[in-house]
Every structure is written in structure tokens, then in C-alpha cells.
């Protein structure tokens, strides 16, 4: 959680484009359409979507507000299931021994091991609950600026994909070069000169 934390780690974005119709309706519809499912798919390894900042485990944008001053405020929630490798190894060893006893053989084939591993993975995937990670978002639509409160690569990639899908607006992550392109008041020639610079090696 970024907004209520004592320390912040954030990524800055420039949002390219504007809505052609009512802004509030477009944002609300995009959030609702791509909110994280209330009921998780027990076989799905990763699930991601929007949820209200004040209610991250109840993604109801009809009930909870997404307006915070001049900003739209909401959260990206990523639910992920992670099965420890040693847990799979343990259950595989038990299942292999059981298979040997049932077949009367002292070995099993590579294909049989693959089938056993897939079966065990499916069973564990069903049983193990997802672990949620929540990343807050602050979006100033008028200024075309947005803060995502994380710098994790995977979270940023999920955010960029879901944001574009939700609003049909392109989020451009701000680095020195993209700041020159999107935020500076330099002329076209000046921008070209800056973008052609190479890093200095010490």
C-alpha cells in the first residue's frame, strides 16, 4: 500500500491521449469492467485487476469512491499462487512410491513422472490460496500524470497492460528520455539533440 505508508516507492507515468466522452463515466466503466473478480478462479495462477483503495478486498466501484481531490484514486491488485518446489518434490516422491507398489515395478517412466507432476501441481494449485499484492494508483487526468506506488517490474507490466485495456489510453513510464519527449518545453531540434546523447562511461 503506497498512499498510507510512511515510506514510498513509486513509478511516474505520462498518460497519452484523452477521452472523447464524459471522463467520469469512462473511468468508472473502465474500473468496473476490469476490476479483479470477487470469486477467485481456484486453478488460476495469477489474477489481476482494479479495486478501490479503501476496500481492496471488495472490488465494488459502485459503492466506494475513486475520486481523491483532483485525482482518480484506485488500486491494482495482483493475486498470485506460488507452490514451493520442495512441496511438489515431497508429494511426487510419495506418489512415485505408490505407483511402484501398485505396478509391481521398481521404476517408472519419464512420461509417468511428468503425468504425476502435472496431477500434483493441479491438486496443490486448487488447495493453495492466492496471496494478494496491492499497489495504489493516483491519476491526475487533466495533467496527464499518474503515480503507481511500486517500482517492481512485474507489477508495472501488469499495470501498463490493464490500464491500456481499461481506458484505451497509453501509459508511458517516465525516465529522463521520456520526460524530454512528453513533459519538456524543448523545441523539436533540442529534443532530437538530447535523445541522441549517449551515456558517459567512467
Q: Where are the language model's segments positioned?
A:
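Internal, charge-rich low-complexity segments
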Residues: 86-94, 178-192
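N-terminal alpha-helical "arm" segments
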Residues: 1-24
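Short cationic amphipathic helices and targeting signals
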Residues: 11-13, 72-75, 144-150
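Short, flexible turn/loop "capping" segments at secondary-structure junctions
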Residues: 5, 67, 138-141
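Primarily extracytoplasmic ectodomains and periplasmic/lumenal surface modules that are beta-strand-rich
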Residues: 20-21, 81-83, 154-156
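Surface-exposed, low-hydrophobicity interaction/linker segments
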Residues: 25-62, 66-136
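Aromatic/basic-lined ligand-recognition segments
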Residues: 188-202
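Internal, hydrophobic cores of structured domains that mediate oligomerization or house catalytic pockets
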Residues: 102-183
